[in-house]
């Protein structure tokens, strides 16, 4: 998908005045794509609302032309839906409003939907996801029926699925129940990583099948938001100027991604993300991200699934690494803690320090044992 660029980038060194100028340039207005067969016109960069405490940021996003807003009831310690509903009330028909349920059964899904509608003060969601499902067995038929019934009743316009494992969910997607899929997609899945970008093939298929494709986890760990000195991801974006902008441009280079939902907690982040919509991904960005990938490699899960079932003590390895990233990368300890505490008691009781060595080996270079111990230290 061709998009006009505001200026050309010279192939140059990563650091120095050129890199600094990339960060300081003024933002422009939003650009738009069509969300699959839904026909909805959505801004290429949407608004991920985790950890947003300043309601004026939403108004600023609207001023830039952002019209896609993604939330969940557990974001920002339970206040995100209420705050976003208030912010969007006057522009409700102009925006795409999304939320989700992490329910395990149909009854809870329906209850979650009704409560989210009440919290936001809206009559309907444009998209309501069955959230965080990575195995088709975790989505029973009666939950699909409940989602379809909600659509028929006008409580939701489009049926969504949120997953961290799009390949694993392909059999469910093949049933053609869903209208929109929310998936991780970032530069760690690019040609310069160790594993083949098979997720890109699955995403392309979703696009060709008419599904709306929304990308999450677009910053590959969110390290830009970390400000605490004692955390391992501190300062990675600071050490690699322009990495945040380049990471989002990498995602937007794909014609199979219709919109994205990066979290934004400041005007600076918002303006930089808006810039990404008007600048092409180029050779300079490639250099920046190659360097950045090597810095984050030991810490950030690619969600490739290679470690599934590898722990002899039954730990959900990739989930635990992701929960640590919520705390250490995003600076969102409460989210990581809630996810960890939702695990079965026998999983929460495991201590990796008890093992002499770790049976899990990551093909992408994540230091699995260190990350799991970190999760247990933080959340157990």
What are these regions (language model features)?
Residues 131-315, 319-322, 329-335, 341-344, ...:
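Beta/alpha (TIM)-barrel catalytic core signal, keyed to glycine-rich beta->alpha loops juxtaposed to Asp/Glu
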Residues 45-53, 99-107, 233-239:
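Active-site mouth loops of central-metabolism enzymes
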Residues 1-17:
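N-terminal secretory signal peptides and thylakoid transit peptides that target proteins
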Residues 68-87:
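Glycine-rich, proline-tolerant flexible connector loops at the mouths of alpha/beta enzymes
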Residues 120-135:
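Active-site groove signature of glycoside hydrolases
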Residues 58, 81-89, 109-118, 137-146, ...:
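Distinct, well-ordered alpha-helical segments
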Residues 20-45:
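C-terminal segment of N-terminal export signals and the immediately downstream linker at the start
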Residues 35, 47, 69, 84, ...:
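Conserved, mostly hydrophobic/aromatic
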């Amino acid at each position: 998908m061709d998009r006009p660029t505001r200026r050309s980038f010279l192939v140059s060194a990563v650091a120095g005045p050129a890199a600094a100028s990339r960060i300081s340039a003024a933002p422009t207005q939003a650009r738009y794509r069509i969300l699959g067969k839904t026909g909805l016109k959505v801004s290429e960069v949407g608004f991920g609302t985790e950890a947003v405490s300043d309601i004026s940021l939403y108004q600023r996003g609207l001023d830039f032309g952002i019209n896609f807003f993604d939330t969940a009831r557990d974001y920002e310690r339970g206040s995100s839906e209420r705050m976003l509903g208030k912010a969007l009330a006057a522009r409700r028909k102009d925006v795409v409003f999304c939320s989700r349920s992490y329910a395990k059964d149909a009854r809870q899904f329906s209850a979650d939907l009704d409560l989210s509608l009440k919290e936001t003060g809206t009559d309907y969601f444009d998209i309501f996801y069955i959230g965080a499902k990575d195995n088709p067995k975790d989505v029973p038929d009666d939950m699909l029926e409940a989602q379809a019934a909600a659509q028929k009743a006008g409580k939701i316009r489009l049926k969504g699925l949120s997953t961290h494992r799009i390949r694993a969910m392909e059999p469910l997607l093949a049933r053609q129940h869903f209208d929109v899929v929310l998936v991780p997609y970032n530069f760690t899945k690019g040609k310069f990583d160790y594993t083949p970008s098979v997720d890109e093939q699955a995403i392309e298929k979703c696009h060709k099948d008419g599904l709306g494709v929304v990308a999450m986890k677009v910053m590959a760990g969110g390290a830009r938001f970390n400000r605490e000195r004692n955390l391992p991801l501190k300062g990675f974006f600071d050490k690699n100027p322009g990495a945040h902008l380049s990471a989002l441009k990498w995602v937007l280079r794909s014609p199979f991604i219709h919109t994205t939902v990066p979290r934004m907690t400041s005007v600076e982040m918002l303006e930089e993300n808006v810039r990404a919509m008007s600048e092409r991904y180029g050779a300079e960005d490639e250099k920046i991200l190659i360097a950045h990938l090597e810095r984050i490699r030991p810490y950030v899960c690619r969600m490739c699934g290679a470690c599934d079932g590898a722990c002899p003590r039954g730990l959900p390895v990739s989930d635990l690494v992701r929960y640590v990233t919520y705390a250490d990368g995003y600076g969102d300890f409460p989210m990581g803690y809630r996810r960890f505490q939702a695990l079965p008691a026998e999983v929460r009781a495991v201590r990796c320090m008890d093992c002499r060595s770790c049976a899990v080996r990551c093909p992408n270079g994540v230091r699995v044992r260190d990350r799991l111990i970190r999760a247990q230290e933080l959340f157990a």
